[in-house]
């Protein structure tokens, strides 16, 4: 028993005295209170009579930083969500992670990060005492609790093979070597008949179908999917695309934010990388958030939350959040910001209404929009330009419709240079003109004698906005006409110190054009790369390139995938054999059997469902690395799960994962993967950081997964290396990597790859990073991996790579993101008021030409039918939306503490709807959609627009430990709490207009639809 002081006796007396007043029925409570004071609340004596069992501090900082010699503070990467912040992990002498906080060197964890040149101990001192009040570097709820998943009993640590039928949840242990043998060589693996292994599938010289050579080689019958780039994407792509050579690779973007990214890419003129912008938080005067809610969601999540909080302190800052449900970004008591409700999937009606008012009232930046080229931009002292004045062929003519008029069209020997109408009314080369006319409609005679109508890009946008009146736009989006005008007027009243940003709220049945129209508002005021406007990120130190120390991109025998992706990405339907065969047979080529996506890539939403239907060809194997479409894609479970359980449709399924997610549970083989704190990797901010930055992840503790025969931890990398070496694929093995001098180096272990990437990062630019000193190496725990660094790298690389890991990455000075009045990286391409690449194509189902500029389309199905026509509002009066949780993410369900904070997700309805359906706050209801039904507890909140059900995302798992499996006949650990709540994606549905069955997708980009699902509700 701990010794009692007089003060403690007084506390006991006060506690007992207070409880006596509650009567004898509370004697047990009183007893527990006394026991807690005497012996600790757990019944065990606490380590300290004052601090209880609190962690021993990592250091004392009274005069200078004196770190606890029993702890190291490792700077690494978080993976609690897709922001992937830099964090610091406290690791004790036993090699156990005991606490997580933020990395003060990292721009995603510190609003104004500490410069990397500051020694580690000095940086830590700045976080302590009074200075720590201003410079505290923290982690969010997900990051702070991520260590619990590292030690979760739900982790998968050894290779497993299914027994019984696919999806039954019965497994057996196998060695890593047996797993490699079976998946490579194939055979009668499950007593269900022969299964081709990866050796048989890897046939780069054999066509899938000799009658359809455009499909490409049999190698394409391997699908590889990755959750996304959590730091190791480059390694997996090296294996799948450039070593094995498959065309079919996918990531989760199609069910995360593809509609927004593609719409943004259309404006930015880059539909390959789909770049996007973020606001200059320190100088913006008016911010409009449409489809994103900083502090509630968005990326970077934590950084934007801090920046919004700081911006609120400025007198000249205002903001509006446009969303169907009130987010944490704004509160009713905040005079700086307000919430504007909007109907789900109607953002472009609001945006186009604003654009119409801006056009009608000439509130656009005319001088900026009149700049027709780079030379004129430089002469005007601008930082960006648009193609608003470039002339577009408006007539529906083969190969010409929607294309920009060029000098080649006017004269046979002319160049492919856009043409504008200058201020004197003359047709001139856009690159030599200083100012061009904004609004043009006139006839032009082409070199071949054709007389065509041409219009300027801005004229086309104006006409698109004029398709509806403000009253009609108001009716479509549910925002009063006066509010549309007020938003447009306010947005254009701050010069260029206004900004619009968006993200996942665009994932609707018209998401691509929603996103493009929203982001177009930035172009109309000319705010790109300017103080108070928006900017593209500062970029990253790309060590996976052919860098200063190693060629990490090029290697002998590197394969360029060929043929057709099953998702039909970046391929025009009109170039397909299906189209040509229909034309040859005298048929109308439209509709195709399924949508094609001529200018957008990344449709994991199409890859699996198309393969299971054998269109355009079947798959033979799937390797999934942590991907989980069966949890993340609305309606996919109902559409595809039973089909995937049939091995005849997809004979071999290998999942690489640290946990049994909803998709991994359907696999034939499971390769256990290392945890975030056990693995290597490199990531970079998605946006919102003006300076260049790259995060370094490294094994701060020893991996817990089983070992291979040669001592490697089993992981994604170990699997790829073993398969590649067994098949003698290029890019792996003893002589896989070269340096600029032609020397060769091995790729036999994960660190062979990542440490050489780190060396490239360390030496990039005019000056390499500094050498790490011994104190930094020791205090940050880099000493644990120093032997691997010394063994793998050249002597002059060791100290600089150690420096990279001691800082958790490489970060350019914060002020490097601001140069000559420009914020962030320069954007050299013209903003696309009219995108001719989009306008060049037709929709493969309806045959209609895609609009080359933003325009209002209602949410629609694949055949062009409006969703409300297929599912009438009279029968389906409500619309479902999902919103990001600020505590739980889809991958953190295995963390118990997050469930303790919030056991189930919020499912919210407006009180007006509650009254309409006879519901009280807390009632249990049945939510029904065309795809299914779930039971939930409803909350009645004024912060939800009438007609909307808002569902918090991240809950309602069926796997991730929610269901018990068996291993060698022994029940595996599980936690039924993980099943709590509901998942909106279980309510998604199949598009009834499609021939090749799939879920409801955005008709342009193929992005999953999770905003605006038709629904109804019943009280239970």
Swiss-Prot record:
Enzyme Commission (EC) number: 1.8.-.-
UniProt note: phenotype after gene disruption: Mutants are defective in tetrathionate respiration.
InterPro entries, per database record: Asp_de-COase-like_dom_sf, MopB_CT_Tetrathionate, MoPterin_dinucl-bd_dom, Mopterin_OxRdtase, Mopterin_OxRdtase_4Fe-4S_dom, Prok_Mopterin_Oxidored, Tetrathionate-R_A_N
Signal peptide limits: 1-33
Iron-sulfur found in the keyword field: yes
Details of cofactor binding: Binds 1 [4Fe-4S] cluster. Binds 1 molybdenum-bis(molybdopterin guanine dinucleotide) (Mo-bis-MGD) cofactor per subunit.
Any one GO molecular-function label of the UniProt entry: molybdopterin cofactor binding
Induction or repression: Transcriptionally regulated by Fnr and by the TtrR/TtrS two-component regulatory system.
Modifications the protein undergoes after translation, according to the UniProt entry: Predicted to be exported by the Tat system. The position of the signal peptide cleavage has not been experimentally proven.
Pfam families: Molybdop_Fe4S4, Molybdopterin, Molydop_binding
Main EC class the enzyme belongs to: oxidoreductase
Topological type in the membrane: Peripheral membrane protein
Location relative to the cell: Periplasm; Cell inner membrane
GO cellular component, one term: plasma membrane
Names of the cofactor(s): [4Fe-4S] cluster; Mo-bis(molybdopterin guanine dinucleotide)
Family (UniProt): Belongs to the prokaryotic molybdopterin-containing oxidoreductase family.
Oligomer status and interactors: Probably composed of three subunits: TtrA, TtrB and TtrC.
Protein name as catalogued: Tetrathionate reductase subunit A
Organism field: Salmonella typhimurium (strain LT2 / SGSC1412 / ATCC 700720)
Chain's gene name: ttrA
């Amino acid at each position: 028993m701990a010794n009692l002081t007089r003060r403690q006796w007084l506390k006991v007396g006060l506690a007992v005295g207070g409880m006596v007043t509650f009567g004898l029925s509370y004697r047990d409570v009183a007893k527990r209170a006394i026991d807690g004071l005497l012996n600790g609340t757990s019944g065990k004596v606490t380590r300290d009579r004052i601090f209880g069992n609190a962690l021993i501090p990592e250091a004392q900082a009274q005069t200078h930083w004196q770190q606890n010699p029993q702890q190291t503070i490792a700077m690494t990467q978080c993976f609690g969500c897709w922001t992937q912040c830099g964090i610091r992990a406290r690791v004790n002498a036993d090699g156990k992670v005991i606490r997580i906080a933020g990395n003060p060197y990292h721009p995603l964890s510190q609003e104004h990060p500490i410069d990397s040149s500051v020694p580690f101990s000095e940086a830590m001192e700045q976080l302590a005492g009074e200075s720590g009040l201003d410079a505290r570097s923290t982690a969010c709820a997900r990051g702070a609790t991520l260590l619990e998943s590292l030690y979760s009993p739900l982790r998968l640590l050894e290779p497993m093979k299914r027994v019984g039928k696919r999806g039954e949840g019965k497994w057996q242990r196998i060695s890593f070597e047996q797993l490699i043998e079976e998946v490579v060589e194939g055979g009668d693996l499950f007593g269900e008949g022969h299964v081709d292994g990866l050796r048989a599938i890897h046939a780069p010289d054999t066509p899938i179908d000799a009658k359809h050579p455009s499909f490409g080689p049999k190698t394409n019958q391997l699908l590889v999917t990755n959750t996304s780039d959590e730091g190791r994407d480059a390694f997996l792509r090296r294996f799948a695309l450039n070593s094995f050579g498959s065309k079919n690779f996918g990531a989760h973007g199609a069910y995360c934010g593809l509609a927004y990214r593609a719409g943004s890419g259309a404006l930015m003129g880059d539909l390959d990388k789909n770049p996007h912008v973020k606001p200059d938080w320190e100088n913006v005067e008016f911010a409009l958030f449409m489809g994103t809610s900083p502090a509630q969601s968005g990326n970077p999540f934590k950084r934007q939350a801090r920046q919004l909080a700081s911006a609120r302190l400025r007198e000249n800052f205002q903001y509006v959040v446009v969303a169907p449900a009130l987010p944490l970004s704004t509160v009713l008591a905040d005079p700086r910001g307000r919430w504007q409700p909007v109907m789900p999937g109607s953002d472009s009606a609001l945006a186009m209404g604003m654009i119409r008012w801006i056009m009608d009232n000439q509130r656009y930046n005319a001088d900026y929009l009149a700049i027709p080229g780079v030379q004129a931009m430089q002469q005007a002292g601008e930082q960006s330009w648009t193609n608003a004045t470039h002339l577009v062929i408006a007539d529906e003519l083969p190969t010409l419709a929607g294309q920009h008029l060029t000098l080649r069209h006017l004269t046979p020997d002319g160049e492919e240079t856009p043409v504008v109408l200058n201020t004197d009314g003359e047709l001139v080369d856009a690159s030599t003109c200083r100012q061009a006319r904004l609004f043009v409609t006139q006839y032009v005679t082409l070199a071949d004698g054709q007389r065509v109508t041409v219009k300027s890009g801005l004229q086309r946008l104006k006409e698109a906005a004029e398709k509806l009146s403000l009253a009609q736009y108001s009716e479509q989006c549910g925002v009063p006409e006066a509010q549309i005008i007020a938003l447009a007027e306010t947005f254009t009243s701050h010069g260029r110190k206004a900004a619009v940003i968006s993200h996942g709220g665009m994932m609707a049945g018209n998401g691509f054009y929603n996103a493009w129209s929203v982001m177009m508002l930035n172009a109309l005021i000319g705010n790109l790369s300017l103080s108070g406007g928006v900017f593209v990120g500062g970029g990253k130190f790309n060590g996976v390139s052919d860098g200063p120390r190693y060629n990490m991109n090029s290697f002998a025998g590197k394969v360029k995938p060929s043929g057709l992706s099953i998702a039909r990405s970046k391929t025009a339907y009109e170039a397909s054999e299906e189209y040509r065969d229909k034309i040859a047979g005298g048929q109308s080529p439209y509709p195709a059997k399924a949508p094609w996506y001529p200018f957008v890539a990344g449709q994991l939403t199409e890859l699996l469902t198309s393969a299971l239907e054998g269109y355009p060809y079947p798959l033979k194997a799937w390797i999934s690395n942590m991907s989980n479409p069966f949890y993340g894609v609305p309606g996919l479970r109902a559409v595809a799960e039973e089909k995937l359980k049939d091995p005849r449709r997809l004979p071999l399924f290998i999942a690489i994962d640290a946990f049994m997610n909803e998709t991994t549970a359907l696999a034939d083989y499971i390769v256990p993967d290392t945890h975030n704190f056990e693995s290597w990797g490199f990531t970079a901010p998605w946006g919102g950081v003006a300076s260049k930055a790259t995060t370094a992840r490294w094994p701060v503790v020893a991996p817990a997964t089983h070992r291979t025969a040669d001592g490697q931890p089993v992981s994604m990398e170990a699997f790829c290396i073993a398969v590649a070496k067994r098949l003698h694929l290029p890019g792996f093995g003893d002589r896989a990597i070269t340096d600029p001098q032609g020397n060769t180096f091995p790729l036999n272990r994960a660190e062979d790859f990542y440490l050489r990437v780190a060396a490239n990062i360390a030496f990039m630019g005019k000056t390499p990073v500094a050498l790490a000193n011994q104190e930094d190496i020791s205090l940050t725990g880099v000493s644990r991996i120093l032997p691997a660094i010394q063994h793998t790298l050249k002597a002059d690389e060791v100290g600089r790579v150690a420096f990279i890991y001691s800082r958790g990455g490489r970060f350019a000075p914060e002020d490097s993101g601001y140069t000559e009045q420009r914020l962030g990286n320069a954007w050299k391409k013209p903003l696309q008021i009219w995108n001719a690449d989009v306008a060049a194509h037709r929709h493969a189902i309806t045959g209609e030409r895609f609009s080359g500029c933003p325009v209002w389309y209602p949410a629609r199905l694949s055949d062009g039918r409006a969703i409300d026509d297929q599912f009438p509002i009279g029968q389906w009066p409500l619309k479902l939306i999902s919103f990001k949780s600020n505590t739980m993410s889809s991958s953190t369900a295995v963390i118990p503490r997050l469930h303790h904070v919030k056991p189930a997700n919020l499912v919210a309805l407006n009180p007006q709807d509650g009254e309409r359906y006879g519901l009280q706050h807390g009632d249990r209801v049945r939510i029904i959609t065309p795809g299914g039904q779930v039971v939930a507890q409803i909350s009645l909140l004024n912060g939800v627009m009438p007609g909307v059900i808002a569902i918090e995302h991240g809950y309602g798992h069926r796997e991730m430990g929610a269901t018990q499996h068996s291993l060698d006949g022994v029940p595996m650990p599980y936690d039924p709490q993980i099943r709590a709540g509901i998942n909106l994606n279980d309510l998604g549905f199949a598009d009834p207009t499609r021939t090749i069955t799939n879920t409801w997708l955005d008709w342009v980009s193929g992005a999953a639809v999770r905003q605006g699902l038709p629904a109804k509700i019943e009280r239970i």
